[in-house]
């Protein structure tokens, strides 16, 4: 896959900029604060629809603008050219178009553009807690198979519902709440085991490269 051209509109510090890229190694050189990392962030956003800096959508929109646009011309491994356009709003409710056709779900874009980002923050994989390593594995699973994104979202949804129930009960569960908790626990075990299995398989695939 090749990103042939990248256009940014009101993304971070870019009011409007277009970058023509070629195959091979590309080096971006500039002064501090000119937007080198922002350029990499835009490419990464096309891949996972989130920032590798772990910031909200509001931070990606240039000051004074209502929305940001990332537009890319890509060539896939079969030589086919596609135009991808991602709109980012301050509320996070943007839209995605592929070849001028709007996707019903923004997350249907996952898997179209594949990137691998390495930054100093990635040292948290070693120095940080287990949550950082789980997030890394989950991101990799989604990159390998987009169906894993739905599984990850379901785990997050069930966990959120379960924790909300416990918080509302304040440690005092009546009969109805206990039944509901059992339902959420069973669902969490089900989807959690599927996600855990995917993580274990991925770790086994990575072992020859990190051992």
Where are these regions (language model features)?
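Generic alpha-helix structural propensity
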Residues: 23, 34, 38, 55, ...
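Glycine-centered flexibility sites
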Residues: 24, 30-35, 64, 100, ...
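Nucleotide-state sensing region of NTPase/ATPase domains
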Residues: 44-132, 136-148, 208
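An accessory alpha-helical subdomain
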Residues: 124-210
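Pre-Walker A-like glycine/lysine-rich segment at the N-terminus of P-loop NTPase domains
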Residues: 1-45
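Basic side chains
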Residues: 12, 36, 53, 62, ...
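Short, mixed-charge, low-aromatic patches
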Residues: 1, 14-18, 90-97, 168
């Amino acid at each position: 896959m090749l990103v042939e051209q990248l256009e940014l509109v009101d993304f971070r510090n870019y009011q409007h900029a277009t970058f023509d890229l070629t195959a091979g190694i590309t080096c971006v050189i500039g002064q501090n604060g000119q937007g080198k990392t922002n350029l990499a962030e835009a490419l990464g956003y096309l891949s996972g629809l989130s920032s590798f800096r772990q910031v909200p959508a509001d931070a990606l929109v240039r000051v004074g603008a209502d929305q940001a646009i990332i537009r890319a011309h890509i060539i896939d491994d079969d030589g086919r050219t596609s135009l991808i356009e991602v709109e980012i709003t301050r509320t996070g409710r943007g839209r995605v178009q592929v070849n001028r056709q709007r996707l019903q779900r923004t997350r249907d874009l996952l898997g179209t553009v594949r990137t691998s980002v390495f930054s100093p923050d990635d040292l948290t994989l070693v120095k940080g807690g287990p949550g950082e390593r789980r997030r890394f594995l989950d991101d990799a699973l989604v990159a390998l198979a987009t169906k894993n994104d739905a599984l990850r979202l379901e785990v997050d949804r069930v966990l959120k519902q379960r924790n909300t129930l416990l918080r509302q009960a304040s440690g005092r569960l009546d009969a109805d709440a206990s039944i509901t908790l059992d339902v959420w626990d069973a669902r969490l075990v089900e989807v959690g085991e599927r996600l855990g299995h995917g993580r274990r398989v991925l770790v086994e695939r990575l072992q020859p490269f990190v051992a």
